Amino acid sequence: MTLAVIGLFTLFTSIIAITPAREFVSLAEREDALLRELFQGYQRWVRPVQHANHSVKVRFGLKISQLVDVDEKNQLMTTNVWLWQEWLDYKLRWNPENYGGITSIRVPSESIWLPDIVLYENADGRFEGSLMTKAIVRYNGMITWTPPASYKSACTMDVTFFPFDRQNCSMKFGSWTYDGNMVKLVLINQQVDRSDFFDNGEWEILSATGVKGSRQDSHLSYPYITYSFILKRLPLFYTLFLIIPCLGLSFLTVLVFYLPSDEGEKVSLSTSVLVSLTVFLLVIEEIIPSSSKVIPLIGEYLLFIMIFVTLSIIVTIFVINVHHRSSATYHPMSPWVRSLFLQRLPHLLCMRGNTDRYHYPELEPHSPDLKPRNKKGPPGPEGEGQALINLLEQATNSVRYISRHIKKEHFIREVVQDWKFVAQVLDRIFLWTFLTVSVLGTILIFTPALKMFLRTPPPPSP
């Protein structure tokens, strides 16, 4: 009894193990027979049409998976896409009932007729650009081929508002040899499929639409499909590492006039800022394309600051010259200078005035100079009185000389202090002037770019 049960169990498991393999072999044999039947006498160089005046209708669509790079310097856009191509090949039809219910097969794309659709604006010499993957052939003759492709397409860059710019890059697809009478392109979907798109860290795709067009050549019409990609740069990186440092450098230029006028580091600070701006300008030159048509926004701003800093150096040298003026350097102060810079402007600039601190002293008194008498008087009380008078006259002359000398030194010191105060007033004037120009220049330069950056793109035309 035990042996009988073991035998039945072994027979049952053998049947289960053998049956799927037989069915698999049968399915493979049927698919092999189908392929032999379909491709017997099949010529992949011949268009799949029954009449010469018929055209092959190719449904075309684009799916983007990644925006790899946008090279502004070389004006290239690198993308990874899938090309959706679908057409009818009447020579590849069969009845599924005759082949075990097989409704579709996968065949190498090299063995069937393909529409030679290429990217016209290809920039790396590989116009086909796609991988020769297998195509899906259905029993009704409908062929679907979706090869992945990596393209480097030419794109004219407009860097006017860099780094707040938007670019319009296009990809034009069409048949290389077939005109519109042989191959008719049909746009599957106006919008590019972005369901599996991998975000780019620098660019954002605002819109990606396709439109059908045609070009005329020797009385023949060649259809094509153009996909336009509206790209917006994400400016955070350039704002943090380019624009904000430039704003800081311009602010340092303004602070030069807040330093004391006798500081020799004022010119050194302005010169260091000018060198830093030159380095930033060289960095931008490595990024943007070398074009004389437009000047990028950040380039305009850097040139503005460089002119700004150069003027500040010139003004600083003038202020230092004023600071070191005195009567000893043969720079007497004019009355209008004294009235303007020592009386009027300090009140307008909220500075403590330096007015009426001194008057021009009379270095030579109008009183007659008393000269000592050398006459010797007669001896006695009168002679002693005359000697005392002479001694007093000599002492008076000495005191008068010392007084004149002190007044002169005081006058020179006051003149020096007045010129220093004039230099302070000039510093305060240029501080507010340069601060106003810096703020207004920054606003005027960046406002159009910010308006364009924040503007919502128009909806695509149907």
UniProtKB/Swiss-Prot annotation:
Presence of keyword Ion transport: yes
Residues that span the membrane, as ranges: 235-259, 267-284, 301-322, 429-446
GO terms for MF: acetylcholine-gated monoatomic cation-selective channel activity; transmembrane signaling receptor activity
Stretches with biased composition (Basic and acidic residues): 362-372
Assigned protein family: Belongs to the ligand-gated ion channel (TC 1.A.9) family. Acetylcholine receptor (TC 1.A.9.1) subfamily.
Assembly and interaction partners: Neuronal AChR seems to be composed of two different type of subunits: alpha and beta.
Name used for this protein in its record: Neuronal acetylcholine receptor subunit non-alpha-2
